[in-house]
């Protein structure tokens, strides 16, 4: 099994004073839309069979071009939303023993898995190693 851990494409910055409910609807900016459009080509050789995303609009928007290109449904999962607990995200990872899946999520969630928050639009290609471990295979910088 391979996981492609995608931090959503660029979506500008959270505006001061904006609550979580409104921030969930923040769309990608122009650069983010270009990054999302490049994912089908970037991921072409991985054989992706599942697309999972945070329910936040910027995450869903990041994977929509890939979903269209691969004719795959996008599965919204609360375990990929901002503020998720470590136990929840590792339980989701444990569900994937045979799929090649994209998890589109946020910096804080990726920080729980990777120990760092990668750049927006970037991808870590990893293999779960059991016992809450990931074997890092490759880092893919954000598409230009």
Give residue ranges: language-model regions:
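Active-site-proximal alpha-helix that buttresses catalytic centers in soluble enzyme cores
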Residues: 1-79, 83-88, 116-124, 144
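Active-site-adjacent alpha-helix immediately C-terminal to a catalytic or transition-state-stabilizing loop
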Residues: 87-136
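Short, solvent-exposed aromatic-acidic interface loops
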Residues: 135-144
């Amino acid at each position: 099994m391979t996981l492609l851990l995608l931090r959503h494409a660029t979506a500008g910055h959270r505006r001061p004073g904006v609550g979580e409910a409104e921030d969930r609807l923040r769309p990608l900016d122009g650069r983010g839309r270009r990054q999302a459009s490049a994912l089908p080509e970037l991921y072409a050789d991985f054989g992706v069979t599942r697309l999972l995303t945070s329910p936040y609009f910027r995450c869903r928007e990041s994977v929509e071009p890939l979903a269209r290109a691969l004719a795959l449904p996008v599965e919204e999962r609360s375990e990929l939303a901002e503020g998720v607990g470590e136990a929840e995200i590792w339980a989701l990872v444990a569900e994937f023993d045979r799929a090649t899946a994209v998890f589109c999520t946020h910096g804080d969630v990726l920080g729980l898995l990777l120990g760092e928050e990668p750049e927006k639009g970037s991808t870590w290609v990893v293999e779960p190693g059991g016992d809450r471990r990931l074997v890092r295979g490759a880092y893919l910088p954000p598409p230009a």
